[in-house]
């Protein structure tokens, strides 16, 4: 009858005086009777409870065992933490609150740990982005010296091209000289014909 509410009703009046152990990593096949058999050898047990889903009625994978004496609970913790039950290694810890807060704490405790991890991950992301931004700025500062280096050979090339530019201009002048020399050679022949 430990599965039903009868056992829970018996333990409810005195539950605040009990020392609770929270058992994590339970197999879905493990029942309250299985937990009772595992822990009752270490002392008198006042209550055993495994929370179940409202709709599927399936175990949530953790449970609670309450001892009348704190010494018995601590002794059971030392003996059962890491023990294999239904192929699972039990993780046993002292629970801080009674059953209602334990159930909420079990849900909220896991959620609280996950929430505490998420801001750390979020806080890391801006750090990486901030560390990357100065690297980009450094690359921008490095670009001007490379441009100066590129400008210097261009200037040299321009100066060379300017020094080479006069020869084609000189090529034009001999043509003019040839045309002038031809006109000069033709002019004396005309003067001779006139003399005749």
Swiss-Prot record:
Its main location: nucleus. Extensively phosphorylated on serine residues in the RS domain. Residues 91-106, 145-160, 167-176 have a biased composition (Basic and acidic residues). Residues 19-97 form the RRM domain. Residues 91-196 are annotated as: Disordered. One of its GO terms (molecular function) is RNA binding. Residues 184-196 have a biased composition (Low complexity). GO terms for cellular component: nuclear speck; nucleus. SMART domains: RRM. Keywords: Developmental protein, mRNA processing, mRNA splicing, Nucleus, Phosphoprotein, RNA-binding. The keyword RNA-binding applies. GO terms for biological process: mRNA splicing, via spliceosome; regulation of alternative mRNA splicing, via spliceosome. The keyword Nucleus applies. CDD domains: RRM_SRSF2_SRSF8. It comes from the Eukaryota. Gene3D superfamilies: 3.30.70.330. Transmembrane segments: none annotated. It is found in: Nucleus. May play a functionally redundant role in embryogenesis. Belongs to the splicing factor SR family. This is Probable splicing factor, arginine/serine-rich 4. It comes from Caenorhabditis elegans.
């Amino acid at each position: 009858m430990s599965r039903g509410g009868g056992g829970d009703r018996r333990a409810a009046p005195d539950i605040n005086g009990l020392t609770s152990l929270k058992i994590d990593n339970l197999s879905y096949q493990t029942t309250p009777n299985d937990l009772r058999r595992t822990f009752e050898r270490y002392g008198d047990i006042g209550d055993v409870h495994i929370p179940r889903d409202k709709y599927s009625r399936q175990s949530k994978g953790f449970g609670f065992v309450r001892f009348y004496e704190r010494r018995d609970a601590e002794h059971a913790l030392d003996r059962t933490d890491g023990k294999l039950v239904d192929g699972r290694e039990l993780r046993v810890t002292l629970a801080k609150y009674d059953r209602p807060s334990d159930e909420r704490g079990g849900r909220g405790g896991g959620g609280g740990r996950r929430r505490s991890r998420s801001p750390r991950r979020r806080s890391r992301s801006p750090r990486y982005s901030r560390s990357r931004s100065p690297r980009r700025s450094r690359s921008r500062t490095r670009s001007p010296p490379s441009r100066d280096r590129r400008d210097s050979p261009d200037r040299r090339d321009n100066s060379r091209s300017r020094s080479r530019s006069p020869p084609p201009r000189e090529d034009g002048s001999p043509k003019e000289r040839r045309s002038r020399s031809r006109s000069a050679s033709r002019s004396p022949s005309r003067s001779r014909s006139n003399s005749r």
